[in-house]
Amino acid sequence: MNETDARVTDEERALKDARLLKVVLALALLCGFALSRRLWYSTPGRLYPSVPFFDFLPTVAPSVTYVWFGALVVLLVLVASRARPRAYAAAFVALACAYVLFDESRLQPWFYQYLFMMLALAAHSWRDKDAREPLRACALMVACVYFWSGTQKLNPHFFTEVVPSLAAPYLSRLPASLARLTTTLGALIPLTEICAGLMLLTRRWRRAGVLLALITHAFVLLLFVPFRRNNVIWPWNVASAAFVLILFRRGAGGARDFLPRKALSLQTLALVLFGLMPALSFFGLWGQYLSSALYSGNVARAQFTVSEQVAGRLPPRVRSKLMPADEGFRLDINHWSYAELNVPAYPSEKVYARAAAALCRLAESPSDVRLEVNTPPRFFGGSAHTTTLDCDALKVSR
């Protein structure tokens, strides 16, 4: 086979991979939407607040949210079913980006990654058979996500809190001598992810990288599926495994092929958003969920203490998540978010403050609601600290 024939074969393979990728991506988004549907349209009796990125943005009417969400679903069906989905993918990206602006909680890690991949598909001219650039941009994004996901987990909270909590159902069945090895074995999780991210970008170690990535997703599913935890990430893990198999096939190229060749390119955007910007999260300059920090133990955590009067006024779905406390009840914001939206709370001070304000509207006195935010230490300066605010203090801080 001469060089021209080889290039044509590579282009044809890339186009087939791009078509398969768009179908998997659209199905993954549809599954994510279905499992977190209350996040995407207004439901009667919802207490958890919508938090726009900009305060000047108006509240979206419930009827508009249904139409907006329906349009996104229709566009995904068209992306999956049409041979040339560029216009539908571009429309989806535009509508989805605008929709996220009206509620920070919608910027979930899985949605952020899917949105970039849809942008890559929208940027590709489907009349051109060479789809290698969008595929390489998506591949670079996937590798960076593994790398930073592992890096974010290199903190004490992950080993002492996250791992024991997730593994508890299995550890309870093991002898105490083996259960003590949890922290040691937990160290393999971030190392596996970091190695997977690096190996996927090399020809020599790619097979090992693919294997490590697949093992990671199988392990996550074993921790979550049998115990019905956070089911919105189930399709994300299945889709991520599929992305690895599609994007890192034998002819995917070496590390140089994944790096940008032009300043203005999809690969440059992938490198900036997923390769460089996550480093800023360790300085508090970039979002944790935009830096693959889900289940890392490296995000600020918020809890509320509410009085009996406030507890009695909560929706039943939220009331079931209350835990007894010395003064009233405690409510973890993640439990609240799962109860109403089926997604974890977006970790930002603005979201925490707005959630506290929603509870304060049910209070009779400022002390009926207290917000407690525990901020972990940063890698580069900044120690762990706890901030506690009641309803009066929240009014001053806003």
Positions of predicted regions on the chain:
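Alpha-helical membrane-anchoring segments
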Residues: 2-398
